[in-house]
Amino acid sequence: SIIIYKANTAMKYEKSKQVQYAVYNPDLMKISGDNQDYFVKKQIISAINNNNIFAVYQPIIDNKTQKVVKYESLIRINGVDNNTISPSSFLKLSKQCNLYNHLTKFMINEVFNKLLTTDIDISINISINDIMNLSTNNLITNKLKKMPQEKR
């Protein structure tokens, strides 16, 4: 969670400066990576806090028929100046910062909500770690249970 991330950031600062304690503030994030990492972390946190995460749906086309057979859901972040940030810029860092689960849960909720309003098939990219995460696993299970039988 964001609270754990902030606590870890303060703890890293405390250890690096060999002080008795540290109180979190956004400038402490600078110690945990270079300026680019710092900038991306700020954008991830801002996107989570301000609902600036969104899904795009990439068509999957059957090579024989040249028709769309389903869509793949892909996460994006609306960054500074409304620029779109692709996962290659933030997913690895989000895992290191304990923010990844927020992004995964967003995508699961987003895609299941989309499935309720459309007849198209949509895939979600999840890893074995996502499946093994109890909270994520429970979310997927609960969403599937609530999904009408014909939409599963």
Can you say where each PLM-predicted feature lies in the sequence?
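Conserved long alpha-helical elements within nucleotide-processing catalytic cores of c-di-GMP signaling
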Residues: N8, S88-K92, N101
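Catalytic strand-loop-helix junctions within cyclic-nucleotide turnover domains
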Residues: S1-I3, Q18, D27-G33, I60-T65, ...
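Catalytic/regulatory signature loops of cyclic-dinucleotide turnover enzymes
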Residues: Y5-P26, K42-F54, D81
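Generic recognition of well-ordered alpha-helical segments
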Residues: Y5, T9, F39-K42, N109, ...
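Active-site core of bacterial EAL-family cyclic-dinucleotide phosphodiesterase domains
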Residues: N35-L93, N125
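Nucleotide second-messenger and two-component phosphorelay signaling modules
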Residues: S16-Q18, S46-N50, D62-K64, V80, ...
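Signal-transmission/dimerization alpha-helices at domain junctions
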Residues: Y13, L93-C97
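Catalytic core of bacterial c-di-GMP phosphodiesterases, primarily the EAL and HD-GYP domains
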Residues: S1, K67-Y71, C97-R152
